[in-house]
């Protein structure tokens, strides 16, 4: 492209970039750490399968529990207190991460607050992360070892014993 044409379209490119930035939800990775993991557990940044995979890659070196849930899900409510208690016990050794699907953000935040969740969740309105993982329904909990390998998947309500057994397995 010649310099004259470039000078003519430069203002247009700038305007388009500003408009695109203004239309975003403003929920970029944490600028202070450069991490995709939200520093505020109630932030609920929007993720898709690609950003979720990038986050899992970023977390390699730490065991990870991923729980797929929704605020309107009865079985999710049943296991929520167990997850909060397990996080209090294992949170220094295992990164807990929720994936809120097919939900409204404010309902999800209220659910997290009501059950005392202090670990981050990401927001996936269409449920694309769950679908990309080949999972059906919710709750579903995935346990990853420190090398990033999927150790086991639990579909349905986690009881305390199953939760503790799997957390011990990935954190030892």
Q: For each of these PLM feature ranges, what is it?
A:
Residues 1-11:
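Bacterial N-terminal signal peptides that target proteins for export
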Residues 110-118, 125-171:
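Thiol/disulfide oxidoreductase modules built on the thioredoxin-like
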Residues 65-66, 96, 141:
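Hydrophobic beta-strand anchors of alpha/beta hydrolase catalytic cores
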Residues 18-22:
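C-terminal motif of bacterial Sec signal peptides marking the signal peptidase cleavage site
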